[in-house]
UniProtKB/Swiss-Prot annotation:
Coiled-coil features, chain-numbered ranges: 641-714
GO molecular function: mRNA binding; RNA cap binding
Name of the featured protein: Nuclear cap-binding protein subunit 1-B
Record's subcellular location: Nucleus; Cytoplasm
Record organism: Xenopus laevis (African clawed frog)
């Protein structure tokens, strides 16, 4: 079938020329649209659409073969939820054009090797699975697929490689068997038994030190939190026991069996897994998230058991939909709800479990947290009669299991739940959670409710929270977000610095200059006078207190007023924060003023770091200071610390990028000079760039040193406070496992997990200076678990 447009003989030359150049592009775009949209809603059946599309592509192969190959390789990698549709299409094309089938298989192998070398291991899994399904479509011969699996499993015998490398190749084999296991066993049962025996032996000797640091819950009831390879192995074993029969994979190629079975098959070329290099970054291990079982969905279809391969297939397909459509929540929600096998399963329960599984995934979710929030809101809008009830049931389950829930996951639960409530008028039956009122405030349940209400207030206002939450919860109400000023009341007139604060207030109101402000502050006596020279130069806590308290009070009307005040008096802040003690005291005063308004503290500190009034290390030291111990387990404290670390990391990355860009510019100049020998000025042009590179290298080294120091400060403080707790418990005969200890230890885990890519650079330093063999095993285990993630 040809879709070329033929011009009339009377057409002028120029229009004809224009059409001739644009016509191939139009056809290529149409081919891409046809391939990408096949299998979507249509008046005709999938089978007839596939047959028609195969005819169109066959007719266009002479002119657009390379384009068609590129598109098919693209959809194999990036549209895995429609994999069997595309394998069927390739099967039909192979039956019509054997040479094209061979070229496609070769292109897929090239793509697979390139994808692995680029560390795109999730996409590589989809390519392996696609190749496996081509066995079902009679494109690839089963023996050559078995040979590829043998080479994959052979990686487990390699020496001096990280376990995560072997894990990935084993997972690639096991996760493909639901699609191709039956076909391979029919053709090569002895070889497949050997492969599975090798995998079993590998799994038995495999280290799983990382397991507990990745689990959402520490308790094994009601659902075990299994390591991903262990769970998949159990599912494959059950599938094998059931003679490789599964009921949830859409297999459109069965309708074309009479055509496909006549096609000639291709042998895969011998596949050697790309070797391990220093640049190889493998996926970290996972824990399989379980929230529901068949008892939770009493009506309608039964939920498959946790070790049935159907559960794996359903979850894998839903994960694929999320991966393909996460950028557009409406499309994503519609795709999830139109899941092909939805009538066979309790779909809403599966969707909610998969979404929460991704949201709570450690070290980090596949997508940004807010995506899951907006997606669940969209799903509730599309299914108002059923999905909100499942979501409420899930929320209740999560609440009841808070005592054993990982602190990082509790943070994400708080963020999601408060954001979700804000989109539904904050409606919730709070009385159902009244059991938290009889517990100590440091326990997970009352802490959770308090933090949710704090977040809800950020998304509304204080009085609204008091109106919607019963008065019985008053102990957990957020504080009225007003400031606390020492010098704002005449009853405090006897306080040191009060009279200066009054003068300073009037001066700022009258738009005094920095010089005038400095002259006023000069009159404040220094409590540390004896420690400094006679002029009182140096850290003066009272001077800082009077200035910062006064300024923040005058600028307390809004965030914008506070930002303007910081900008206007930036030079004064810089002068007061010259020393480390000065920086720390500024942070203490900010906390004293705004202790009832955590959000204000967070945004002010963010601004102060950006404007270099304080540095990241000062914020870290402040967080672990005794003054902050009452709020140490509060959510906002850790928001501030992680935000501080991220700012430091971005600063380093920015300078590194500048350095790389400059090096590339210099390399281009050298290349240009080499190609133009007559350019006598080119040597002189290199000079400024080389000097710039030298300066940037110094900046990178300085920034990395600052970054390393920040992590050293944080981990050192963690070790100190945890050690103090352990010693105190040991000497007092008290149980170590208090609510505070669980929270603190899991916050340490959180630092490692959320910033694991950066921390990896400083592992040797951390191991030599802080996490030594002499350290208490309660603390050292956290470091060892982190190391196991990439070992």
């Amino acid at each position: 079938m040809s879709r070329r447009r033929h011009s009339d003989e009377n057409d002028g030359g120029q229009p004809h020329k224009r059409r001739r150049t644009s016509e191939p592009l139009e056809i290529e775009d149409r081919l891409e649209s046809l391939i990408c949209r096949v299998g979507e809603k249509s008046t005709s059946s999938l089978e007839s659409n596939l047959e028609g599309l195969a005819g169109v592509l066959e007719a266009d192969l002479p002119n657009y073969k390379n384009k068609i190959l590129r598109i098919l390789c693209f959809v194999a990698r990036l549209l895995p939820e429609k994999m069997t549709v595309y394998t069927t299409l390739v099967g039909l094309l192979n039956a019509r054009n054997y040479n094209f089938g061979g070229e496609f298989v070769e292109a897929m192998i090239r793509h697979l090797k390139e994808t692995i070398k680029l560390n795109a291991y999730n996409e590589a899994i989809y390519l392996v699975r696609f190749l496996c399904d081509l066995v079902n479509c009679h494109v690839i011969a089963a023996p050559s697929m078995v040979a590829m699996f043998e080479s994959f499993v052979g990686v487990t015998q390699e020496e001096d490689i990280p376990q995560v490398r072997s894990d990935w190749y084993v997972y690639a084999v096991l996760s493909s068997l639901p699609w191709v296991g039956k076909e391979l066993y029919e053709k090569k049962d002895v070889e497949m038994d050997q492969i599975l025996s090798q995998i079993e032996a590998y799994l038995k000797q495999r280290q799983k030190l990382h397991l507990s640091i990745l689990q959402v819950w520490s308790a094994e009831k009601p659902h075990p939190q299994e390591e991903y390879l262990d769970c998949l192995w159990a599912q494959v074993q059950k599938l094998k026991k059931d003679r490789w029969q599964e009921r949830h994979i859409q297999r459109p190629y069965l309708a074309f069996d009479s055509v496909l079975c006549e096609a000639l098959q291709h042998n895969l070329p011998p596949f050697t897994p790309p070797p391990h290099t220093e640049d190889s970054v493998y996926p970290v291990p996972r824990v399989i998230f379980r929230m529901f079982d068949y008892t939770d969905a009493p009506e309608g279809p039964v939920m498959p058991g946790s070790h049935s391969v159907e559960r794996f297939v359903i979850e894998e397909n839903l994960h694929c939909i999320l991966k393909s459509h996460w950028r557009e929540r409406k499309t994503c929600a519609a795709q999830l709800l139109s899941y092909p096998e939805k009538n066979k399963i309790p779909l809403n329960y599966h969707i909610v479990e998969v979404i929460f599984g991704e949201l709570f995934q450690l070290p980090s979710p596949p997508q940004i947290d807010v995506m899951y929030t907006t997606l669940l809101i969209e799903l509730c809008k599309l299914q108002p009669g059923s999905l909100p009830q499942v979501l409420a049931q899930a929320s209740e389950m999560l609440y009841t299991r808070l005592d054993t829930m990982n602190t990082t996951c509790i943070d994400r639960f708080i963020n999601w739940f408060s954001h979700h409530l804000s989109n539904f008028q904050f409606r919730w039956n709070w009385e159902d959670w009244a059991d938290c009122l009889s517990q100590d405030l440091d326990k997970p349940k009352p802490q959770f409710v308090r933090e949710v209400l704090e977040k809800c207030m950020r998304l509304s206002y204080h009085q609204r929270i008091l109106d919607i939450v019963p008065a019985t919860f008053s102990a957990l109400y957020p504080a009225n977000p007003s400031n606390v000023i020492k010098y704002g009341d005449e009853s405090n007139s006897a306080l040191p610095g009060y009279s200066v604060a009054v003068i300073l207030t009037n001066a700022i109101k009258n738009k005094a200059s920095d010089k005038e402000i400095f002259n006023i502050l000069k009159d404040i006596p220094n409590p540390n006078q004896d420690d400094y020279d006679d002029e009182g130069i140096g850290f003066n806590p009272l001077k800082i207190e009077v200035f910062v308290q006064t300024l923040l009070n005058l600028a307390s009307k809004s965030f914008s007023h506070s930002f303007s005040a910081l900008a206007k008096f930036h030079d004064i802040f810089k002068a007061l924060s010259e020393s480390d003690e000065g920086k720390l005291h500024i942070l203490r005063v900010v906390y004293d003023v705004w202790k009832n308004h955590p959000q204000m503290i967070a945004v002010l500190l963010d601004k102060m770091i950006r404007t270099q009034i304080v540095d990241c290390a000062a914020v870290a030291n402040w967080i672990f200071s005794p003054e902050l111990s009452p709020d140490f387990t509060r959510f906002y404290i850790w928001e501030i610390l992680h935000s501080t670390i991220r700012k430091m990391n971005k600063h380093v990355q920015k300078i590194q990028k500048e350095l790389e860009d400059t090096k590339q510019r210099l390399a281009k100049q050298h290349k240009h000079r080499d190609s133009d020998d007559n350019d006598e000025d080119s040597g002189r042009k290199d000079g400024p760039l080389e000097e710039q590179i030298e300066r940037l290298q110094e900046k990178v080294e300085s920034a990395q040193s600052e970054q390393k120091n920040l992590f050293l400060v944080i981990f050192q403080r963690f070790i100190m406070i945890l050690t103090e707790h352990l010693v105190r418990c040991e000497t007092g005969g008290i149980d170590v496992n208090t609510a505070w200890y669980k929270n603190c230890r899991e916050r340490l885990q959180q630092i490692f997990l959320q910033h694991h890519q950066t921390i990896q650079q400083y592992m040797v330093t951390l191991e030599n200076l802080l996490f030594t063999a002499e350290l208490d095993h309660h603390i050292l285990t956290v470091f060892q678990q982190f190391c196991a993630l990439q070992s």
